[in-house]
Swiss-Prot record:
Pfam families: Pribosyltran. The gene is pyrE. Keywords: Glycosyltransferase, Magnesium, Pyrimidine biosynthesis, Transferase. GO terms for cellular component: cytoplasm. GO terms for biological process: 'de novo' pyrimidine nucleobase biosynthetic process; 'de novo' UMP biosynthetic process; pyrimidine ribonucleoside biosynthetic process. Pathway: Pyrimidine metabolism; UMP biosynthesis via de novo pathway; UMP from orotate: step 1/2. PROSITE patterns: PUR_PYR_PR_TRANSFER. Homodimer. This is Orotate phosphoribosyltransferase.
């Protein structure tokens, strides 16, 4: 695990974005941890989060021309990442997002920001079922651009209904590179290093043994 990944997980705990306990997921599974990126809800939180995304993206070596933020959660994430890439990594890239509802006045259309062209990196919080990513891929392709990857905050590294995770399915189905700031494996390593989280650590390890990929 890299330093920035450990710092990111500490930041998530500090802000209550990452919590331990018993949480029922949409899948019906009882998860020993919960991640809610919507709780990064101040200007400084969002700026710092953008820097973590930018770091992970830069270290991945992914080749892309612009960013796309899926409505709604992906919009501030793509904006914060675009700012961080420009300010800290010397990459001033265009970015774009979609509206959930097409506008019928003014400029109209369902896309806002830079025109979707070239190689596009999608920015979102997590991939659960992969539905939002599939919608984004359709939007990008319909505009004549090429989706090349997805950057997410946390990779839960767990199986979907079959043997593969939603992330593995997205990678295989669309040939997309998935970049994460941190993964479940990083979280477990972080918990071991931190100490004081032993009770939760056992539950997270048991969950990974049952549902992990």
């Amino acid at each position: 695990m890299k330093t920035y990944q450990s710092e990111f997980l500490a930041f998530c705990l500090e802000r209550g974005v990452l919590r331990f306990g018993e949480f029922t997921l949409k899948s019906g599974r009882i998860s020993p941890y919960f991640f809610n990126a919507g709780l990064f809800n101040t200007g400084s939180d969002l700026a710092r989060l953008g820097r973590f995304y930018a770091q992970a993206i830069s270290e991945s070596g992914a080749a892309f021309d612009m960013l796309f933020g899926p409505a709604y959660k992906g919009i501030p994430l793509a904006a914060a990442t675009a700012i961080a890439l420009a300010e800290h990594h010397g990459r001033d890239l265009p970015w774009c997002f979609n509206r959930k509802e097409a506008k019928d006045h003014g400029e109209g259309g369902s896309l806002v920001g830079a025109p979707l062209t070239g190689r596009v990196l999608i920015v979102d919080d997590v991939i659960t079922a992969g539905t939002a990513i599939r919608e984004s891929v359709d939007i990008i392709r319909a505009a004549g651009a090429e989706p090349v990857g997805v950057a997410i905050a946390l990779n839960r590294q767990e199986r979907g209904k079959g043997e593969h995770s939603a992330i593995q399915e997205v990678e295989a189905e669309y040939g997309l590179k998935v970049i994460n700031i941190a993964s479940l494996g990083d979280l477990i390593e972080f918990m071991r290093e931190q100490g004081g989280l032993d009770e939760h650590l056992k539950a997270v390890e048991a969950y990974r043994a049952q549902y992990g990929v």
